[in-house]
Amino acid sequence: MNKIWKLKNVKVGVAPILWTNDDMPELGGDISFDQAISEMAEAGYQGTEIGNKFPKDEKILLRELKKYNLEIASAWFSGYIISDFEKNFQDFQKHCLFLKALGAKVVVFSEQTYSIQGQNKPLFKDKPYFTNQEFENLAQGLNKFGKWSKQHGIELVYHHHMGTGIQSLKETEKILELTDPEFVSLIFDTGHFAHAGEDIVFCLKRLISRIRHIHLKDIRKEKINELKTKNLSFLEGVKQGIFTVPGDGDIKNYPLFFELLAKNNYQGWLIVEAEQDPRKANPLEYAKKAMDYLRSLISW
């Protein structure tokens, strides 16, 4: 029997990607926004992140969320600091102001210059790498973006991600070392670190001081091995079922992970995320399965 760890000042949400995949509309394209948010609430979650099917008008979105007592935790932003700083900065400012109007406190940033996460390229064979100069340029840009967002009440959290220039623990540590902790924090994604071959507890110990947002998923190792053997892309891997919800895959040290979060007084959102094919993995069923698993390990 695992000890249940108390996490103070934590909220638990679920990402809309369980229902509809923004990168592959064929996955859950027939599922409505209302179905998704009603099922999030039914499964016991307090909030969510923004997906493509969400209303773009903040007043309408807030009204719909209020029906189910849900909050917006954050939203993804595709960064192009290395390749197109000025336009990207303008887009970022608009994005942050939208999030602020929704009551969010965090913006999820991922540098997409050279990214293959949405392309039909072998994920491991064609992984992009940033030069030292590109790391420096990215860090300087992140400091500027993060300083601006902080002035407007939004914290920038960097998302390490498969198929990008910042995927591994080493790459994540490098960008954190180069950036100002006052302006740049980290979103810790258990699924992406595990997918990259990292141990989530080891990574957590190394990075805990910078973590302000967390995505929780699980992985299926046999599917990752298949992806490597067949030279599949990131999105093909998703379709094959590489990811699932916490407790349903091969990450076995979640109890220790949550113990460390509690002992380090983590504050912020925990967002359950697992991009799967909703025809194979019923979103409501998997959202409830994840909630049951979390409640067996933590209280909040």
Swiss-Prot record:
EC code: 4.2.1.44
Keywords tagged on the record: Cobalt, Lyase, Manganese
GO biological process: inositol catabolic process
Molecular function via GO: manganese ion binding; myo-inosose-2 dehydratase activity
Cofactor: glutathione; Co(2+); Mn(2+)
Residue pairs linked by disulfide bridges in the UniProt entry: none
Source domain of life: Bacteria
Catalytic reactions of this protein: scyllo-inosose = 3D-3,5/4-trihydroxycyclohexane-1,2-dione + H2O
PANTHER family tied to this protein: HYDROXYPYRUVATE ISOMERASE (PTHR12110), INOSOSE DEHYDRATASE (PTHR12110:SF41)
Family, similarity comment: Belongs to the IolE/MocC family.
Protein's name in the database: Inosose dehydratase
Gene coding for it: iolE
